[in-house]
């Protein structure tokens, strides 16, 4: 199942990330908040990667969780992204976070990004991937 930000539900509860700009709140599913990458860390990573020359293609996060890191990459690099999340509630939260970041004035590439509910360890040979994000803080996920 694939989710797009245009279909996101923003009505659920949100939590403010103290490192995010004023008014930018995020959705989390169940116990996902303690695992979420803080916005400031996500943006700094994206700024570092933005300095690199990447080939054409998407940003792929095969274990996207709340989607905050994926949203930061797409926002800062102006690239479409695909996040894959095994847990359905967390995937819906990630999709809502893509829309929230897009609505906060970041790059429109977020609107073209999507979240897939599924197993990120199963490759999709149709994707042209410019960058694969694997969170170094969670090497076993």
Could you tell me what each predicted segment is?
Residues 1-57, 87-126:
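S-adenosyl-L-methionine
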Residues 44-52, 72, 97-100, 104:
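A generic secondary-structure signal
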Residues 62:
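Conserved beta-strand/loop positions that form the S-adenosyl-L-methionine
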Residues 66-78:
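Conserved SAM-binding loop of SAM-dependent methyltransferases across substrates and taxa
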Residues 80-85:
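Conserved SAM-binding motif I beta-strand of class I
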Residues 128-129, 133-141:
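S-adenosylmethionine
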């Amino acid at each position: 199942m694939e989710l797009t930000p245009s279909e996101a539900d923003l009505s659920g509860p949100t939590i403010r990330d103290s490192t995010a700009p004023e008014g930018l709140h995020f959705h989390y599913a169940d116990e996902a908040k303690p695992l979420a990458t803080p916005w400031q860390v996500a943006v700094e990573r994206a700024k570092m990667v933005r300095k690199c020359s990447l080939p054409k293609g998407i940003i792929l996060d095969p274990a996207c969780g709340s989607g905050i890191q994926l949203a930061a990459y797409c926002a800062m690099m102006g690239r479409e992204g695909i996040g894959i999340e095994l847990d359905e509630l967390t995937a819906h939260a990630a999709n809502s976070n893509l829309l929230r970041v897009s609505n906060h004035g970041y790059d429109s590439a977020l609107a073209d990004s999507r979240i897939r509910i599924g197993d990120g360890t199963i490759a999709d040979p149709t994707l042209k991937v410019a960058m694969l994000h694997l969170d170094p803080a969670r090497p076993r996920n």
